[in-house]
Amino acid sequence: MRLLRPSGDITQGAIWKHLLAFFVPLWFGTFFQQLYNTVDTLVVGRFVGKVALAAVGSTGALVNLTVGIFTGLASGAVVAIAQHYGARRWEDLRKGVHTAMLLSLLIGAFFMVAGFFLTPWALRALGTRADAFPGAELYLKIYFLGMIPNVVYNMGTGVLRAVGDFRRPLYFLIAASVCNIVLDLVLVLCFRLDVAGVAIATVCSQVLSAVLVVVSLMRSETAPYRFFPRQMRLYAEPIHSILVIGVPTALQSVMYSASNLFIQAAINSFSTDAVAAWTAYGKLDVFFWMTITAMSQSLTTFAGQNYGAGQYERLKQSVRVSTAMMAGFTLAISAAMFLLARPLVAFFCPDDDVLAIGIELVRFLVPTYITYILIELLTGAIRGAGKSLIPMVISVLGVCVLRLAWLFFVVPVHHTLLMVAASYPITWTITSAAIWIYYRFGHWLEPREKTVQKA
């Protein structure tokens, strides 16, 4: 277990040990965070029905769109705080923490109001099926009421991860996930609240996790990142850092999610069985996404602290190490999902028609996961060095624009579910090649002093 505890200075020592020490708790933390929606889907699919499952599944793209925006902005705070921590600039660190926490309140309030009132319009724009529309609208409206604690939690844990503390966020997520599971079962099985019950359970769990992380930051008495609510201000320098790094990252997330909205709209043009199968597949492929996300976030923190300390060659070495680690993880996940496709899909929805479609999706897509890992890892390293604009442009063109072109020009000619799914590996491969070219030949790894002068 000692191996999984990061040392106080990640600018020295074996790179793989530091990355693994970050990755393991972050992976489990991401697992429990994903467990919110997975448990919702499981409870609805098994105890309510496939129409309710399609309703909850139809909300996924919209939820990911909003989450992508504020997690993108949070990444700006994470990188700035990690660089200050690596360079031991404690006053800048303090200002960054208090600016980030105030921003989380403002962003959460905005999305709470906007999301609640725009939900019906957004679902209609997505072409949500009539039988799934009422449940999807109810779920989303309740979900958006919990935006403030959701954003506060993500920003607060971002602060902790930026300074290398990945264990406390894990503990908070475990507590929140247990709360979510218990409330899901109680509200659906005992009170028969169906879709509303799983949404209420999710919001209550988010409130608990937000309270835990804020209290933890306030009680970090000897730490330079201790949080004092009365010191929350919008300081100019942290705002600049957050916007320079966070806005392109947020836009990239928005474009990813927007392209997925079009994917969801295309999926909605098929049968309810197809929508339910796509939802079940989405809950399975989350195991890959939480793995690559955990490794990418670990690398961003590692890169940010080493960039702040001027350890540029060590930063580049960490990219090679993380790529080798992630390739091994990806091959193992892909093989397991391919071989166990039938029981995995049946776990979420045993309906025969849904099961057949779900198995086909799993075995078509999981072998292509390996084509995506460079996008996430190279972008994470470059972002840790304070650059996020060019990766955003590459991703928007390679993933989003090309994916939309596929949906508008290829899918209408060959209107099948697998043809829609094929948009993923095709765009991943092209974008991976483009981001590697920028990583190899672009001028992204400039010394901090030069970067500051340009700003």
Model segments located where?
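Small-residue hotspots at the loop-to-helix junctions and early N-terminal turns
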Residues: 50-61, 140, 199, 272-287, ...
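Transmembrane helical elements of multi-pass membrane transporters/channels
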Residues: 21-40, 142, 153, 176, ...
